Amino acid sequence: MENKKMHHKRYIAGGMVSLVFMIVCLTGLIVSASGAGNVNTDPSSDERVWNLGVIQMSVSNYWDGVWNLSFKRASDGFVEERNMRIEDAEAQKLYADISCGTVPDGSSLILWLVQGDKAESVDVTDLSEPLEYPLEGFEEGKIHVRLQINGVEDVTSEITIQ
């Protein structure tokens, strides 16, 4: 009878060791990611932007060169991004049809175009018509297209390069 009571202890001990190891690894990951300035939150940077906030009820898809994004609300400073390609910078333009349903005082929606050391931003909070933005100052190749969300809600957008 004593043998039946003892055989579960090693499984419990193994589970406890695994739990402690998992907590140590998670803590190490969080400390290494957030410490020493490793988290990039600058939307004008050519590096990947890490978000420290949340976005709610977000739908984002990229199909046939068109990026569609809609969301209910997001933390201030939240950045959504999509990499697109410029084939002919002299002839192509970025087209953005963006509408913000709710715009509280002091809120904004900023469109960032980033390629290498070049970064340009456009306030697209209150567009009365779709934006046509020339890409003449950029080079052919990959470009980061970012939306920096600062308090706006109920946003729908369609962005493409043609």
Question: Which stretches of residues belong to each language-model region?
Answer:
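Gram-positive cell-envelope targeting signals
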Residues: 1-41
